[in-house]
Structure formats: structure tokens, C-alpha cells
UniProtKB/Swiss-Prot annotation:
<dbReference type="GO" id="GO:0005663">
    <property type="term" value="C:DNA replication factor C complex"/>
</dbReference>
<dbReference type="Pfam" id="PF00004">
    <property type="entry name" value="AAA"/>
</dbReference>
<dbReference type="GO" id="GO:0016887">
    <property type="term" value="F:ATP hydrolysis activity"/>
</dbReference>
<dbReference type="GO" id="GO:0006281">
    <property type="term" value="P:DNA repair"/>
</dbReference>
<keyword id="KW-0235">DNA replication</keyword>
<dbReference type="InterPro" id="IPR047854">
    <property type="entry name" value="RFC_lid"/>
</dbReference>
<comment type="function">
    <text>Part of the RFC clamp loader complex which loads the PCNA sliding clamp onto DNA.</text>
</comment>
<keyword id="KW-0067">ATP-binding</keyword>
<dbReference type="GO" id="GO:0003689">
    <property type="term" value="F:DNA clamp loader activity"/>
</dbReference>
<dbReference type="GO" id="GO:0005524">
    <property type="term" value="F:ATP binding"/>
</dbReference>
<dbReference type="Pfam" id="PF21960">
    <property type="entry name" value="RCF1-5-like_lid"/>
</dbReference>
<dbReference type="InterPro" id="IPR003593">
    <property type="entry name" value="AAA+_ATPase"/>
</dbReference>
<dbReference type="Pfam" id="PF08542">
    <property type="entry name" value="Rep_fac_C"/>
</dbReference>
<feature type="binding site">
    <location>
        <begin position="44"/>
        <end position="51"/>
    </location>
    <ligand>
        <name>ATP</name>
    </ligand>
</feature>
<dbReference type="InterPro" id="IPR013748">
    <property type="entry name" value="Rep_factorC_C"/>
</dbReference>
<dbReference type="InterPro" id="IPR003959">
    <property type="entry name" value="ATPase_AAA_core"/>
</dbReference>
<dbReference type="InterPro" id="IPR050238">
    <property type="entry name" value="DNA_Rep/Repair_Clamp_Loader"/>
</dbReference>
Amino acid sequence: MAELFWFEKYRPRSFDEVVDLEEVKSRLREFVKSGNMPHLLFYGPPGTGKTTMALVLARELYGEYWRENTLELNASDERGINVIRERVKEFARTAPVGKAPFKLVILDEADNMTSDAQQALRRIMEIYAQNTRFILLANYVSRIIDPIISRCAVFRFSPMPRHLMAERLKYIAKSEGVEVKEDAIDLIYELSEGDMRKAINILQVAAATNKIVDRNVVAAAAAAIRPTDIVELFNLALSGDYLKAREKMRELMYVKGVAGVDFIRAFQRELIRMSLDDETKAEVAELLADVDYRLTQGADEEIQLSYFLAKLGSIGKKIRAASLPPKKR
């Protein structure tokens, strides 16, 4: 039997197991307690708990009968609004199992539907409102038409704060017999950008190769540049060894397939940890922003990164000059 994805294995099953989202949990608990609930719209970036919360709500509403009373659909997977209509019609025509007053339809990626399809969805929601409630999941609320928004209680889901993600990752690692270093958690958080699903997946891939997970193991697992490579590039360039720095950069680009934008992100991450004064860090950050902008405008990656390394050499020269004792007159 194939091993479960850790994200599914450790998916919360109750409100108490959900980390963060206290205000959302409080309001949903009231719906469960009263037995009366409007249609819901959960929106926010990927991996922020929208699907998890919808499934937790289903479990809290229906207990052991949650599967029988819940229909999960994905707007991207279905072959049009007519398929969704027929599936909802078939699902809604039977009474809820147990003592539940209504059934539940969870529609993921609702914001990927066209405006016409959403208008049709609005009518479906109205037709079956007597015994069916909808939970719509979306990344962007701005892509949902107003007539649907006005019929829903709207909940915003935000990326998980670092300290809460760290707690969860440490718990999962300990449960799996894996030691995860603090610098590894830092990099996982930066790479996942608060996406809990992505963070857990990175941890699982990293743990598959090494039971002691540090920053470099994470970088390899996520196909990111190793921090040690970036530090080496920084040091070579700052020391004025431009040719070696450029050779290292070209190796990473053409042998390991690192893209220009990935270089920029990796430099930005490691810059914070460099033992440079704040003024120098600000100068390098401004230089990175300049190169990043040019890359987004279609400039040649190798030329722009070579320019960046050359400018680092000039910055390093200024640092060394400033550290020399003043000449005696």
C-alpha cells in the first residue's frame, strides 16, 4: 500500500485540531450549534485551509454520516455547468441521512468558472436551497460575481504565520521520527509562502532522503538552490573574484537548471543572514530589485546575473577600503 501524503495523513478532523483561524472557527461553530447555516464562501491563497475547514465543518455537522451528506466537486475538473447541475440535482433529490436539516455541496475552484457559469450556479443554489447548502472555495473573491457573494457568508483565509507553521511541522516531523532543524523550517516557510500544504509536501520529500532535515536537504528536495551555493557566490563576488563567481553561476544555470528568478529569490533569502551592515544590505537589496525588474521585462538572464556579480565586486571593494586604517600624512 502506498504511503499517504502527509498533508492528508495529518489533515485536521475537527475544529480543535485546526491551527489558527480562530474567528472562522468561532462563527462556524455557531452554525453547527444552531443547525442553521447559509451558503458559505471561503476565499484565500492556496494551502490556507479552505478545503480542510469545509471538510471539518462537514464532520462537525453530520458526524459519522458526513460522507453520505457531502458532495465534493471541482469546477476545473467538471465538464461544464450542466454536469455540475445534474450531479447536484441527483444528490439533492434524496433526503439527508441522519437528523441533518440539509446536505452539503463543496465546490472547489469556483473562481475558475466563467461569469455565465456562475450565473447558472446561482440559480442552482436557489433551486436547491431548501435542503442543500453550498460551500464555495476560491483563491480570488474578486472573480466571484456579486449575486453569489450576496447569498453567502464570506470568510477570508490567510497564509499561516511562521510560528504556527513551525509548530505544526515540528509535530509532524516528530510523529514521523524525523529531526527537522530550525534553519530548515525557515527555508520551508520561505519557499511555501505560508501555503501549509506545500510546506508539508516539501518536508515529506526532504525526509524521504534524510532523517535529519537541514536547510540544504530542504533546498535539494524543493529543487531550489542550496544555501551553501548562494553563500559561496556571494563571497566570491564580494571578494572580487568575478571570474570564479561567474563560473559558479553558469554551472548552476546550465548544469543544474537554476532559473534567473530563482537566483534572485535565493539571494534575497540569504542576504538577511549575511554578516553585512544594514547600509550594505540595503544597497544589495536595491541592486537585486533592479535586476529582478529587468528579468521580468525579458532581459537576458546570464547578462543580468553577471552584472549583479560585478556590482557585488564593487560593493566588496568599498567594504574593504572602508576597513583599512587611514593613511598617515
